Amino acid sequence: MTNILIVEDEQNLARFIELELTHENYTVDIENDGKVGLDKALSKPYDLYILDLMLPNINGLEICRQIRQKTTTPIIIITAKSETYDKVAGLDYGADDYIVKPFDIEELLARIRAVLRRQPDKDVLDINGIIIDKDAFKVTVNGHQLELTKTEYDLLYVLAENRNHVMQREQILDHVWGYNSEVETNVVDVYIRYLRNKLKPFNKEKSIETVRGVGYVIR
């Protein structure tokens, strides 16, 4: 199921778009406030963001900029601003498409299909700018490839695959080292430290959070 976040302060318009997208079998969340929308965009994974520009508290350009720093997920801007420099600004801030209001809903649906088609089909996870390419067995941050051992890679991947879900040390041990492993659970802590040290130069070490007494989670 494709998950879409709409950040739009015109509630009637947002609701109309939501109904149309739901009819097309998309899952939709709506926020009418810029700050709340940004918080949601950065805390929950989506497949597409639809942003208005003129929003309370934080404008759409700033939301677009901050999302683009964290992920390559498609962004479509919908706005009444029709000047060329507004369109250029939106695209320069990282938007994939820009639609001027009022628009026909069929055009929006077509543009959504188009940007989603451009997304690669390969097995790639994007966690706050940490790009994990399973096919290529490669991890990059800000364009720089991380030199990881197989165990470090497997550990990072299993955390990323279970993003926002706290994993117990025993669960991690089973996934990375195997069910019949005689490795102690404190080895998980050691490898988490290795990973954080390699992410630290890119200020990404805090992406892996410790849940005291339980285990770890990546957000």
UniProtKB/Swiss-Prot annotation:
One of its GO terms (molecular function) is transcription cis-regulatory region binding. Residues 3-116 form the Response regulatory domain. Pfam families: Response_reg, Trans_reg_C. CDD domains: trans_reg_C. Keywords: Cytoplasm, DNA-binding, Phosphoprotein, Transcription, Transcription regulation, Two-component regulatory system. The modification 4-aspartylphosphate is found at residue 52. It is found in: Cytoplasm. GO terms for biological process: regulation of DNA-templated transcription. The keyword Cytoplasm applies. Residues 122-219 bind DNA. InterPro entries: CheY-like_superfamily, OmpR/PhoB-type_DNA-bd, Sig_transdc_resp-reg_C-effctor, Sig_transdc_resp-reg_receiver, WalR-like, WH-like_DNA-bd_sf. Phosphorylated by ArlS. One of its GO terms (cellular component) is protein-DNA complex. Member of the two-component regulatory system ArlS/ArlR. This is Response regulator ArlR. It comes from Staphylococcus epidermidis (strain ATCC 12228 / FDA PCI 1200). The gene is arlR.
